[in-house]
Structures are given as structure tokens and as C-alpha cells.
């Protein structure tokens, strides 16, 4: 495994361990709540910026007949996502090692697109390109699910969260707070249907690509 991949894996593991503590203590799984935003089974679900694919088993449990394609630029990280799915008892995950700004997928092909804790890793310009590409591959009326950080509430929590972000995340992560994520989703051509801010450290956004 390449050194770059090992570094990314270490960051994913550290971040997941930290985030999962409040989730396990105070709420049901953020991953399960993310998958639950889709009420109807998608024929094709594309998971963009997959990383290690922590949310994918939840989608597979909820929609066992769905075709799931995982997209990440790092093929080694994608293999870890496949391994995670296999360990959870799910086979058939399709891997696409590709740039999320220019995916080798046809236009209007996906019923749903998911992005979990990947957008904030990129600056505003790249996020806009990724969201535009997600809009391109979605069918008219298709759904976009985005899970990412939300701003902390309370003096103590905010201080701890700011320290966590300073140590683990890029400097532009604050751009997605206070409505920034939803505005950028809308700017990419989506209609925002639902926003959830009631989960630990997490904002969930459900959006729809308008009909042609």
C-alpha cells in the first residue's frame, strides 16, 4: 500500500474514532440516519468521495437490490471500502477510481448520489465542480444526500470542536458552516428538500435535481 494511502487511512481512522464517540453516546448511528434520507430504493446509487466507505453498508442493508458504485481517486482506498462491504456481508460493490470533478459516468444515469464527509476536504472551487458533476450524472428528479460537519453549539463544545478541526481538517472547513453547505448545493443547480442539524457534529442535506 502506498505511503499516501496509509496516511489517508490513518486520518480516516482517527476521524471516525473521534466522531463515533458522541454518536454512540447521544444518538443513533449518523450513517444509518444518512441512508434513511432516501425513502425510495434507488436503482443506481453513486457514492462520491468514498474514502473507506463507512456509510455503504448502511445503504446496502436498506436497499439490498440497489447497484452501488463507489468513486474515489485513490484505488487503494477503494479496495478498503470493498473490504468493509465484504466484512459486512455485502458483495458486488463496483469501484471507480476517478476524479469526482470529471467522472467516467454517463449523464443522467444515477437515481441517487451520496457524499459523506468528503466535501469539506476540498476548497470552494473544487466543491462546486464536484457538486456540478453530481448534478450531471443524476437523472432529473434524482436525489443528492450530503453528510458533513456542522458548527458546534455552546462555548465548551465550540472550543473543543475548533481544536479538533485545527488538528485534523483543512483551513477552509468553516466555509460549509452556517448555511454555507446548503447554499453551495443550491448554487450547483439542486433544490434543497431537507436539512437535519440534530445529529452530533453532523449536518445532513437532502437535495433534488430539478426535472428537465
Where are these regions (language model features)?
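Conserved SAM/SAH-binding beta-strand->alpha-helix loop
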Residues: 74-76
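Conserved alpha-helix/loop element of class I SAM-dependent methyltransferases that forms part
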Residues: 25-42
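A short acidic, Gly/Pro-enriched loop at the edge of an enzyme's catalytic core
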Residues: 101-113
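C-terminal alpha-helical "lid/dimerization" subdomain adjacent to the S-adenosyl-L-methionine
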Residues: 55, 145-188, 192-204
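Conserved SAM-binding strand-loop segment of SAM-dependent methyltransferases
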Residues: 89-102
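Conserved SAM-binding loop
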Residues: 81-82
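A short glycine-rich, Lys/Arg-flanked "PGG" loop and its adjoining helix->strand segment in the class I
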Residues: 128-140
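Conserved SAM-binding loop of SAM-dependent methyltransferases across substrates and taxa
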Residues: 52-63
Amino acid at each position: 500500500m502506498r505511503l499516501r494511502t496509509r496516511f489517508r487511512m490513518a486520518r480516516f481512522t482517527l476521524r471516525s474514532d473521534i466522531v463515533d464517540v458522541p454518536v454512540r453516546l447521544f444518538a443513533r448511528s449518523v450513517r444509518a440516519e444518512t441512508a434513511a434520507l432516501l425513502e425510495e430504493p434507488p436503482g443506481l446509487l453513486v457514492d462520491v468521495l468514498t474514502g473507506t466507505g463507512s456509510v455503504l453498508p448502511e445503504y446496502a442493508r436498506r436497499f439490498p437490490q440497489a447497484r452501488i458504485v463507489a468513486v474515489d481517486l485513490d484505488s487503494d482506498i477503494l479496495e478498503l471500502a470493498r473490504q468493509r462491504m465484504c466484512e459486512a456481508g455485502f458483495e458486488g460493490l463496483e469501484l471507480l477510481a476517478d476524479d469526482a470533478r470529471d467522472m467516467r459516468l454517463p449523464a443522467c444515469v444515477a437515481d441517487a448520489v451520496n457524499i459523506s464527509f468528503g466535501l469539506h476536504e476540498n476548497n470552494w472551487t473544487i466543491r462546486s465542480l464536484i457538486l456540478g458533476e453530481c448534478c450531471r450524472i443524476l437523472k432529473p428528479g434524482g436525489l443528492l444526500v450530503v453528510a458533513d460537519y456542522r458548527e458546534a453549539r455552546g462555548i465548551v463544545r465550540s472550543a473543543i470542536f475548533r481544536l479538533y478541526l485545527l488538528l485534523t481538517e483543512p483551513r477552509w472547513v468553516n466555509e460549509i458552516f452556517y448555511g454555507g453547505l446548503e447554499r453551495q448545493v443550491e448554487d450547483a443547480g439542486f433544490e434543497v428538500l431537507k436539512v437535519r442539524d440534530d445529529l452530533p457534529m453532523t449536518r445532513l442535506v437532502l437535495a433534488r435535481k430539478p426535472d428537465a
